[in-house]
Amino acid sequence: MFSALHSKCPDTVLLLFGDGELYKKIQDKVKKMNLEDSVRFMGTTDEMPKMYQAIDVFVMPSFCEGLPVAGVEAQASGLPVILADTITKEVGVTNCVKYLPLSDDKVEWVREILNFRGFKRYSRCEELKRAGFDEKDVARYFQNYYLKVLENLK
C-alpha cells in the first residue's frame, strides 16, 4: 500500500511503530521494494503522544486488533484515522475515522489517505471523554478485561 502511495507522492514517509513478530519480514520487504529512504522503523516508544504530532494520517490495515488503543489515541491528537473494517467500531468515536475493507484494492486506501490532505487537526479529547474514553474509564476497562483473563486462567 505504501509503495502505491509513495509513487503518487514521492515525499511521503512511512513511520512504523512496534517490534512484533513481523518486524524482520517487513524490513526485508522494504529493502526489496527499495523504500529504505522513505520508511522509518520507530520501534516501541512511550512517547506516542509526541509522535502523533509528526504524523499526517494514522492508518491501521490490520487483520486482528481487538480494541486498538493507538487508534483512540490518534483521534485524541486530532489525526484523521483510517482503519480496517476488521477493527471494532467502538474505536471510531470521532468524525475523523474511516473504515475500509482489507479486500479493497490498495488504490482505495491510497485515495482515502490522499483525501485527508489539508485536514484541519484539533484535539478531540472532549469527544473521546463523552464517548467513554476518559483515561479513568479506559484504565478501568483494561483492568476489568485483564481480571477476566486471569480469572479464566484459573
Task: Enumerate the language-model features and the residues they cover.
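Short hydrophobic beta-strand element within catalytic cores of glycosyltransferases
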Residues: 80-84
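A conserved nucleotide-sugar
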Residues: 1-41, 154
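An anion/phosphate-binding loop that grips the pyrophosphate of nucleotide cofactors and donors
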Residues: 55
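A short hydrophobic beta-strand element within the catalytic core of glycosyltransferases
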Residues: 58-59
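A charged, aromatic-enriched C-terminal amphipathic alpha-helix characteristic of glycosyltransferases
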Residues: 120-154
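Short glycine/serine-rich donor-binding loops of glycosyltransferases
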Residues: 68-73
